Amino acid sequence: MQVFAHRGASGDNPENTLIAIERAIQFDADGIEIDVQLADDQVMVFHDRWLHRTTNGIGRLRDASFEQLRQLKTHGDQQIPTLLEVLDCIRGRCQLNVELKHKEVAGPTLNALDFAVEQLGFAPEQLIVSSFHHRLLSELRYNWPQYNYAGLTASVPLDLAEFAQRIGCSAVHMDVANLDDDLIKDAHRRGLQVRVYTVDEVDDVIALQAQGVDGIFSNYPSRAIAALKPKEPSGEKATHGSGVST
């Protein structure tokens, strides 16, 4: 089961920042998940519509100029990065899942991914584009078929994983709170992977692996990776009642 660092290693670092991304790579995460939005014609790596939760700014991200955004600091004294800065930081060292927060950011994002493949050492199969906007994913796959697409859902759809297959996705990304065995089985029957968000508890990590989930998104990737490592056999030899070691 693969481990994706959710917004980078965001449990111990400011989310969606270069330091969180670099830390996730140091932890040997299989991939990193980030969120992108458009502001002042720049693809910014940021989750919320509003600035105040994670930065010292106020107002909406989309209303700020690029210069204003550059002056802001996150709670960990980091800048809000652009997508190109994130791609340049990773340079193909792991997979990257880019979640599109709205339709307008899609074209500039895919153009940036093209640049990453041409100039920054990524292979197309390392790049995943995900969104709750399923029609948008279908349109993007028509124009950029070389990338992987994943349909996000917070509930169990009536048609289970059929929606993802219908729009040409290679995976379903599902909320851990509503994960369903029938959805996992249906997705696998259709040749789709199932990745689950957001998984921070060790017990959940182990249980999801047993359920056959293909990947998880975690704010604490090092914790999840450690939980998935095979337990090393004890170096002590077994001792029988006779006192003879075998």
Mark where each language-model region is:
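Phosphate-group recognition and catalysis centered on beta-loop-alpha active-site segments
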Residues: M1-T246
